[in-house]
Amino acid sequence: MLVNIIFLSSCSIQNERTAAGLNIEKGILFYSDENNIQEEDSYYEALIELKHSYPGQFDNYKIIAKNQEYDSAIASLNDTYPALLVIKDNKVVCKVVGIAKKDDILTPVSNVLEEWN
């Protein structure tokens, strides 16, 4: 099985894609494919742990379901499922994509959320 994981230098480099149309100062977007939910267990486990550790950072948290239509700004940020994006100042500062272990999701995302405290 092909594993597709993208880490942006410990999630510190800003991605070229922006969320400008969304006006997100700080936010977390989880792109979910409900037809392949079994592949997303590690993401849900990581999200539960992250929400427990950083409850204040989940004020602007949204699940983006693959089978639904969304604003073009949300759609332009990602086209791979599952994926977890962390947005700061309308830029993607952390992106984990594809099948990943819980720790491979937790580490980069925690590093970014820790900076927000």
Whereabouts are the PLM-identified features?
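Sec-dependent signal peptide recognition
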Residues: 1-4
